[in-house]
Every structure is written in structure tokens, then in C-alpha cells.
Amino acid sequence: VIPFVASVAAEMMQHIFCAASRKC
């Protein structure tokens, strides 16, 4: 199975963490 969902989830998680920690 192509890990497309995992890739998108990882990117979204990183973006959310960036916004939450305000280190963008």
C-alpha cells in the first residue's frame, strides 16, 4: 500500500505542531 495517507498525516501533524508551538 502506498503510504500516501501517512505522508499527508505527517505533514499535517507537523504543521499543527508548528502553529501550536508558534515557531513557524
From Swiss-Prot:
InterPro entries reported in the protein's UniProt record: Antimicrobial_frog_1
Keywords: Amphibian defense peptide, Antibiotic, Antimicrobial, Disulfide bond, Secreted
One Gene Ontology CC term in the entry: extracellular region
Reported function: Antimicrobial peptide active against E.coli (MIC=8 uM), K.pneumoniae (MIC=14 uM), B.cereus (MIC=12 uM) and S.aureus (MIC=17 uM). Has very little hemolytic activity.
Tissue and organ distribution: Expressed by the skin glands.
Protein name: Brevinin-Eu
Domain of life: Eukaryota
Bridged cysteine pairs (disulfide): C18-C24
Subcellular location: Secreted
